[in-house]
């Protein structure tokens, strides 16, 4: 049976992650409080942040920025919007 968590992002009980997705204390908090669905949403947002801000993930400052954004996305007031992103018109 799948592990469930009370997802802090979605505000409902949902299937939990299979393993901590990030090292350290932040990864543990995400594992205990974030669902697979909410994590998938973060991965999409993270991709937009990397692309729109032209982040070089070999740069430690870019990785630190993404870690701060991840924490804000799940446990703070929300991550930065992707600057310059315009959603496709339907």
From Swiss-Prot:
Keyword hit for Signal: no
Entry keyword annotation includes Iron: yes
Any one cellular-component term (Gene Ontology): cytosol
Protein origin, superkingdom: Bacteria
GO process annotations (BP): cellular response to oxidative stress
Any Pfam family matching the protein: Iron_traffic
Cited InterPro entries: Fe_traffick_prot_YggX (IPR007457), Fe_traffick_prot_YggX_sf (IPR036766)
Transmembrane segments: none
GO molecular function: iron ion binding
SUPFAM superfamilies: YggX-like (SSF111148)
Keywords: Iron
Family in the record: Belongs to the Fe(2+)-trafficking protein family.
PANTHER family named in the record: FE(2+)-TRAFFICKING PROTEIN-RELATED
The protein's role, per its UniProt record: Could be a mediator in iron transactions between iron acquisition and iron-requiring processes, such as synthesis and/or repair of Fe-S clusters in biosynthetic enzymes.
Name used for this protein in its record: Probable Fe(2+)-trafficking protein
